[in-house]
Amino acid sequence: MSLDEFTQLTPDDLISSLDNFQQEIVRTLLKVTNGNYLEVADKWLSASPSNTAKFGGEINRSVLYREKVVDEIEKFLCGNDSTYEEERRKLNIQSDKSQKYIVGVMSTAIGGQLGVAGTFIAPVIVLLVISMGKMCINAWCEMRREIKTKTS
């Protein structure tokens, strides 16, 4: 499975790549928020101060922290930064990649950059990938470039 194929998976397929306890929490939060993936990501990031020490754990800051994760996902998927070059190379040469494997590689690498455990950040990564919709990686990366150009 390529990264582009990964981003095209259904929300249920992406959520099923998480550990069972994470799937249960994410699905419950999605019901409570009427399927708002970004709101669930924010709730996850503000879940508890002990889990989010590097982020601060404050609810009103969760959007800022979500944007940090989005920036890292952009670096990973778009390849516009050498930070994740080794991980992308491994994914390109690995022939049998499941969505669980891809989530594991992404969450470990991004979690390492942000100073949090990959297992903590994995649901946020999945929710943010789902929020991309069915947009292919190239289109999403181009959209992110345009947004950054307009805001700078």
Where are these regions (language model features)?
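Alpha-helical interaction segments
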Residues: T33-N34, F55, R66, I130
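Cytosolic/matrix-facing juxtamembrane and C-terminal tails of multi-pass cellular membrane proteins
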Residues: E142-S152
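Mature extracellular/secreted ectodomains of secretory-pathway proteins
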Residues: S46-I102
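Membrane-inserting effector segments that mediate pore formation, membrane fusion
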Residues: Y84-E142
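N-terminal leader/propeptide segments of preproteins
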Residues: M1-A53
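Charged/polar, solvent-exposed surface patches and flexible loops
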Residues: Q8, S16, R27-K31, K43, ...
